[in-house]
Structure formats: structure tokens, C-alpha cells
Amino acid sequence: MFQIHYLNKISQQGTALWTEDFALTDDMETADGIVLRSANMHDMELPGNLLAVARAGAGVNNIPLTTCADKGIVVFNTPGANARSVMELTLCGMLLGSRDIIGGVNWVQSIKDDPDVSKLVEKGKSRFAGHEIAGKKLGIIGLGNIGGPLANRARKLGMEVYGCDPHISVEAAWNLDGHVQRMKTPEEIYATCDIITVHVPLLKETEKMINASALAKMKDGVIILNFARDLLVDDEAMADALASGKVARYVTDFPNPKTANMPGCIAIPHLGASTEESEDNCARMAVRQMMDYLENGNIVNSVNYPNCDMGVCQSEGRITILHHNIPGSLGRFTAAIASENVNIAGLMNKSRGEYAYTMLDLDHHPSAEVVEHLKEIEGVVRVRVIR
């Protein structure tokens, strides 16, 4: 029986999926799998028997990915499970940035006890006037699970939509509205659009991509939205751009001491994925991926090892090997198995950067000698006997 430990409260829509082969444990030291949302694992001592970590959400900055990979711990996330929630809040952000709705609501609260509140509203509402989004040019950097559907919704709202994503998948491209105009570089987006939103992962090359240089290339009075990652935007440069009027409004889902006190910034309390539907979807996806890996050895939506799926084992035995991506490894694995007079019924080998994963279905249950032989091969991190 597999032991599962939660580091955060997980939706019952997900926890109800565990079968009788899984049991919850309060002791992380005994856990085969950990499921979490936002808990920080960087300072945790990872137990030696831990096999997998599933993040009920997309971001994995709270998980030590390389450390996990080196220990043979597969880390999963749930891309797309919260995409609709984030996309809808981004649409809301466009409206909040284009019309001073928040300022108007706050003003009404300040005069709510005045008996002439209705007259005051009619007299003072003009100070909160804004602009329609229909007809405006929307630039979307990143056309994945959030950016793609956002582009399609914005088109239906009458916006001119421009998208930039050099890594767009074939599926995402096929699903994109035919009227979305493709831009080759973010710089083309900067020069063209009235509203700009970023939907890219936080990587070394994307950190502070919205900086002083990028802002200087944008239209005066541009509205910028960030519902992806806090550090995609240089806060110091943004504060200067808001003060000068270069940026009319900055809407972010990531408040910090700088943005929470930044004039012209609307800081939303990280509500992008905070819907019941999103939390349910993420939990279901995380649990299913965890169960499939622990029971069958299949890897789907890992962020530190390659995806590799051979379905449910139909043979008498299955071995999986987490290893470093060293040339010739597969040959050494098959030779080790053949030396024990074991026939391979099927195999799959995938690599991802420095790491690789091999699944081997065998004609009979592997012996302890076969397993030990595999463990001794250079670069092997972990060997599991699934069946």
C-alpha cells in the first residue's frame, strides 16, 4: 500500500479518487508520495523512500526540482487545470485597467452615509470614466493554456489580438482564432498594442522581461497585465513608467511591498486560480497522475523527468529506471536484463535534459539479481519494480 502525505489542504474532489491501494499518512517520513499546493519544500529534508511529488497547480517554484531529480523523485504539476480561472481573471484585469471601477467603488463607500449619495454619484461619476476594450489592440505574450483561450475570448469581445509565442504547440496553434495576428517578437507587441499581457513561465531568460528597455518601446498610456509570475516584471521600472504616464495602469496578481504601495497599480491578492472549479480540477489531475505513476510507472506532466507512458502493464513484469541521460545507457540496461535470461516484451526510453527515464516490460517478474545489476549501472538514480 502506498502512503500519501498532504502539505496543504487538497480539494475533496481529488482526495476522493484514491483507491484502496493508497492510504493517507501524517508522517512525511513514511510517504511514498506528497501532494501540495503552495507549501515551500526547499528547506525540507526529503525522505529516502519518497517517490513522487504532485503540485496541484502549475507553478513549481516552491519545489526543489533538481534535488528531487537527483534523488529519483518525480515532480508533477497540473498544467491547464486552472487555465480557465486565470484567463477569466485576466479578462477582468483588462476591464479594471481600462475603467476606474475600483476607484469608483471606493469613492461610493466613502460617501455611503451621505443622504444625498445619489446626487453626489451623478455629479462625480465622470472622474472615473474610462475606455471600452472593444477595438483596442491586445498583445498576448505566450499562447499556451491561458494565452490561447484568452486570445479567442478577446476576439469575441471585439478586440484586435496580436500574439507572440515562438514555442507554441501544434494543438494550441490549431485552436487559435484565425484572426489572431502572429508577431515574431515581443518587441513587435510592445510597439503595436494598447494592452499587453504576459503568460510565460518564469525562466532565467524571462525574469524581468518587462523592464525599462521593454517599457520604452511601448505606446504611451499602455495597460500592462501580469497574471503569470511576479518576477516577469521589473517593479522599479514599472513604478517609474506609471509615474511618468508611460504606463496608464499595471494590473498584477502578485502583491508585494512595492506593488501594494505603487500608485497606478491594481494589486489583486493572487486570485488567479482561486476558484472552486480550479482547485477541484487541479486536485483531480494531481491525484490521478500520482496514482498512475506509483501503480504503473507512467509519467505524465512531470517537470523534472520526461513524460513516458506505456499504459497499464500487460506483461508479467515491469521495471522502471530513473537515470542520468548518458549515451549507451539503454544498451547497458537491456544487456543486464538479457544476461539474466529475461526477455523484454516492450520498452520505452525518453530523455529530458540531463535526466532520462526507461520503462521495460518483461516476460516474467524480475529477480532481485536483475534489479541489483541495473542499480549498479553508471548514472542510474532509482530502479522500481512495478510488477
Tell where the protein language model's regions lie, with residue ranges.
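An N-terminal-biased, well-structured beta-alpha scaffold segment characteristic
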Residues: 1-79, 211, 216, 223, ...
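Phosphate-binding beta-alpha-beta segment of Rossmann-like dinucleotide-binding domains, i.e.
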Residues: 79-137, 171, 301-303
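A conserved regulatory-domain signal marking ACT and ACT-like small-molecule sensing domains
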Residues: 304-387
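Rossmann-like dinucleotide-binding domain for NAD(H)/NADP(H)
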Residues: 220-313, 357, 361, 372, ...
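Rossmann-like adenosine-cofactor binding region
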Residues: 39-44, 166-259, 274
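Oxidoreductase and adenylate-handling cofactor-binding alpha/beta cores
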Residues: 87-106, 154-159, 285-298, 334-338
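Hydrophobic/small residue at the entry helix of a nucleotide-binding pocket
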Residues: 146
